[in-house]
Amino acid sequence: VVLIHGWGMHGGIWSELLPALEGYETRLTPDLPGHGGAPCPDGRYGLDEITAALAPEVPAGATVLGWSLGAMVAMNLARRHARRVSRLILVSATPRFTNSDGWDCGIADGVFDLFARTLVSDYRQTLNRFLSLQVRGSATSRSTLRLLRSVLFARGEPQQAALAGGLEILRHADLRAWLGEIRQPAHVIAGLRDRLVPPAASRALAAALPAGRFTELPEAGHAPFVSHRTEFISALSAPAATEAPA
């Protein structure tokens, strides 16, 4: 299994979850380019470039679990490197983060505009504000925020170019046009209290994926594998018959 983290974080975010995945012979937690210990490539920092950089670290036939921005990368891996991905687990996932014509399951553009304005002057404060948004609404918001903040810079600080490029993906990427090309089984897991990716977006994503299915965690926010680990682990192994229809 390959676990792909979200914007501003690194692969260490999965450390508490890994023991529950002992059924997998290999458990990989790569850093996205420019995050943790991974170098940041020169030139454009877009979804395709991130995917190309990460693809060599994904063994053939892997289960790929992606969270938030990492879920977008996971879906692009499944599309462009289909032989490497046998199954997707998409956590707090959406095909588009912001609202647009024909898509009202996102959040207002202004949220990411504010992050973009403050990123240059104080990226640490920007990242901490982003963490606060991630836990907002969760029943365990305070303890979850403490844990996320304790992990944030554990592998070093992310590079500015990676933060800026990743934020542009969050603001503008729209995967809806090619979701039908993803043929691998895809399990979409969402927290009902997520304020960054509304559950309606994750439900719509599951419905748009040819082999998608959907599970909702009622008390969780944007980081359910941190805030509600027991429920999240149960959801990973839940049979399709017990899950909410997409």
Regions found by a protein language model. Name each.
Residues 66-70, 74:
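Gly/Ala-rich beta-loop-alpha elbow adjacent to hydrolase catalytic centers
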Residues 195-201:
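Conserved alpha/beta-hydrolase "acid-adjacent" motif
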Residues 217-233:
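Catalytic histidine-centered segment of alpha/beta-hydrolase-like enzymes
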Residues 182, 188-190, 194:
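Short beta-strand/loop motif that positions the catalytic acidic residue
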Residues 48-62:
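Conserved acidic catalytic loop of the alpha/beta-hydrolase fold
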Residues 1-43, 47:
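Conserved HGGG/HGGXW glycine-rich cap/lid loop of the alpha/beta-hydrolase fold
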Residues 120-173, 177-178:
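Conserved alpha/beta-hydrolase catalytic His-Asp/Glu region
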Residues 79-80, 84-121, 162:
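Flexible "cap/lid" loop of the alpha/beta hydrolase fold
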